[in-house]
Amino acid sequence: EMKQKVTASRLADILDHVNRIYQGGYYSTDIGTSENINIRFNLATHDERGNRLATPGVEYVKWDGTYPIDANDFMNNNKKGYARYLWEPNDYINVMVYPFAPEANSAEVTLGVSHLPFTLKGVNETDGLSALESKYNDISKKNLSFAYCSSINSDFIDYEVDRYTNASHN
């Protein structure tokens, strides 16, 4: 359905904001501005099999389940095979955009959920990241049983992106 799809131009705008943040001096908070960490993100032009994408950065996949989607189930269930929607996580950052099901008995709305990033426990462990035991040092598509990704609620993608890019709200 078209209302569930994010346009190529909107994705390019989102990634432009993200890249400006990572190039430094763009996003200012009470603890300082963003720093240039020499990373630039690009929308994939080809899928992991080498096929050209009609919309850069997007593979539209028909969902066989019910809408809206239970984000907790999608992100954490290792029995339903949702890892099949991933591209190799060592080559791509997997971001899934779909309408989230409301949480039972709650007026709260989840805007986004992420497993990223991880760090390995030990000497080089990075504060603020989810730490994994070193036996999990090979996070690859072939050994994942759950959807190792970030998910954004498509009903709120503009709000979520604007929140991280310091845009104002009315």
Predicted feature locations:
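Metzincin-family zinc-dependent endopeptidase catalytic domain
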Residues: 20-169
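Primarily auto-inhibitory N-terminal propeptides
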Residues: 1-17, 21-22
